[in-house]
Amino acid sequence: MTDTHFLIPRKLVLAILHHIQTQPEQEVCGLVGGNPGKAASYYPVDNIDPLKTNRFTLDGAGQIAALKTMRSRNETLVAIFHSHPHTTAQPSSLDIALGGHSGVLSLIGSTGTRGVLELRGYRLDAAENGAEVELLMGDEG
């Protein structure tokens, strides 16, 4: 990830869209592996939050399994994804308050706007406080 953009393969966007569509009324979440500045793989992780319609908590065992697979593929954690089922793909006040991980992009997806996938990236760590990062979609990967 550079300061201004992040490369994401079209097939990864489609995988995220499919995941959103499996549970359209709940927030879904997952991890994205790759190399700095470029996504390579999407790892869906169960949302174990009791308030799944507007919050997410990544399942710990699912996170560990995804990180082990990333390591075996020589990938690192480059983004954390979650969906907003009824609003736009912008950080909520809770997303901003909880912050992000330094150097890890926060991807937010939504189909809440006319059923069309909206996917956006943000840096939610304390230093950046919600700065948007342009997502560049390509056919590679």
Which residues are covered by each model-predicted region?
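Conserved beta-strand-loop surface patch within small alpha/beta domains used
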Residues: M1-L77, H86-G141
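Metallo-beta-lactamase
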Residues: S83
